[in-house]
């Protein structure tokens, strides 16, 4: 048998959208608990379920810069929209010793490095979006740990989602593009989970319907 497959999946703007400025998402998540205020990205639940059906036992780990206190709300949301169950790696909300806001970039990098160390036998499908840091984080990880990354799937945000996410339409800086290309990992992108599933190999998602 080859290495086990695992999935790391971002939450905000990847599997779920709130149509709120990213700077307000933390406070929104902290005080507004209703899962109906969030919308599922089409096809993302189906994509994750196909990965698990094709690779029995593959864990799905949800990685987010959201606060721990919204985990019950997210679990309700995932159950209502038929997302596979999986652990959530969240962060604490509030000021730190170095500033008023915690670094989402560093949180994700730290958690991913920990997964590489704690689960050396797993190769990862990394799923995120192009709104802020995911392409940079995943590209750097694949460049440094190419043998641990099976593929990278990036959801392409709409123009309005880019604005709310605090991102923009400017291409990645050249070193970031080079890191992504030189990583050796398969990189696919699309507007939703259905498009990503069509572009990923059958070894990950099974035969195309």
Q: What does each model-found stretch correspond to?
A:
Residues 1-105, 166-168:
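Alpha-helical substrate-recognition element adjacent to the catalytic core
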Residues 66-209:
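C-terminal cap/substrate-recognition subdomain and adjoining C-terminal extension
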């Amino acid at each position: 048998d080859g290495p086990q497959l695992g999935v790391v999946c971002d939450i905000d703007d990847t599997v779920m959208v709130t149509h709120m400025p990213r700077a307000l998402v933390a406070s929104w998540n902290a005080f507004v608990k209703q899962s109906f205020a969030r919308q599922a990205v089409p096809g993302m639940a189906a994509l994750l379920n196909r990965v698990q059906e094709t690779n029995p036992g593959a864990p799905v780990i949800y990685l987010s810069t959201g606060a721990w206190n919204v985990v019950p709300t997210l679990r309700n949301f995932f159950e209502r929209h038929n997302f596979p169950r999986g652990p959530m790696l969240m962060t604490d909300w509030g000021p730190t010793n170095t500033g008023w806001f915690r670094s989402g970039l560093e949180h994700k990098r730290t958690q991913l490095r920990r997964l590489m160390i704690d689960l050396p036998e797993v190769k990862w499908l990394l799923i995120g979006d192009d709104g802020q840091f995911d392409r940079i984080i995943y590209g750097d990880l694949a460049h440094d740990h190419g043998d641990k990354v099976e593929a990278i799937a990036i959801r392409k945000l709409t123009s309005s989602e880019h604005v709310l996410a605090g991102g923009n339409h400017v291409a990645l800086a050249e070193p970031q593009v080079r890191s992504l290309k030189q990583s050796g990992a398969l990189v696919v992108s699309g507007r939703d989970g259905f498009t990503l599933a069509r572009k990923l190999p059958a070894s990950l998602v099974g035969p195309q319907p």
